[in-house]
Amino acid sequence: MNKLQREAVIRTALELLNDVGMEGLTTRRLAERLGVQQPALYWHFKNKRALLDALAEAMLTINHTHSTPRDDDDWRSFLKGNACSFRRALLAYRDGARIHAGTRPAAPQMEKADAQLRFLCDAGFSAGDATYALMAISYFTVGAVLEQQASEADAEERGEDQLTTSASTMPARLQSAMKIVYEGGPDAAFERGLALIIGGLEKMRLTTNDIEVLKNVDE
């Protein structure tokens, strides 16, 4: 298979993923849809895990449009824009969060991660805090999408309103709180959670004055 054919395999696999989900995505089914023998896929993907890694990379390449800082970004707008863009990329495909979880980043993703770290360090974060900040937001985003996609699949299977079903067993305070969450929907829940994380990071960031003081000490 040449490069073009490899890209065709990935494109077809993403289409199949949307049709049958991660569990139904097998190399046998993929080969059938492509009209080739199953061993032909092993030229590029030695197993399903390698295929999933390629799909995860493709999801980000196609849909993650704010993966690196823009000229008009400050650290807050970048973290928010990056997380929202990452979330959209995962939501663009059925089981997108499950596909992404546990994958190994390819070289292009590592380069982008390095650019993100450099940007946050220049904004006043220590290398450690910048790393943990990116990890925390990434984990939060993947977890939020994982829960959303699982909840949507569960609601479709059950064919019932989860809030109505469980409301009678909830304490009054929890019932009111969950009503806010369900009425706001997953978008509002994600944005609020992200705002709380970014607000917390503000407390850990060095100010411009702090940076200048450290520079003077080093000199």
Swiss-Prot record:
The keyword Transcription regulation applies. One of its GO terms (molecular function) is transcription cis-regulatory region binding. Mg(2+) binds at H100. Keywords: Antibiotic resistance, DNA-binding, Magnesium, Metal-binding, Plasmid, Repressor, Transcription, Transcription regulation. GO terms for biological process: negative regulation of DNA-templated transcription; response to antibiotic. TetR is the repressor of the tetracycline resistance element; its N-terminal region forms a helix-turn-helix structure and binds DNA. Binding of tetracycline to TetR reduces the repressor affinity for the tetracycline resistance gene (tetA) promoter operator sites. NCBIfam families: PRK13756.1 (NF010319). This is Tetracycline repressor protein class C.
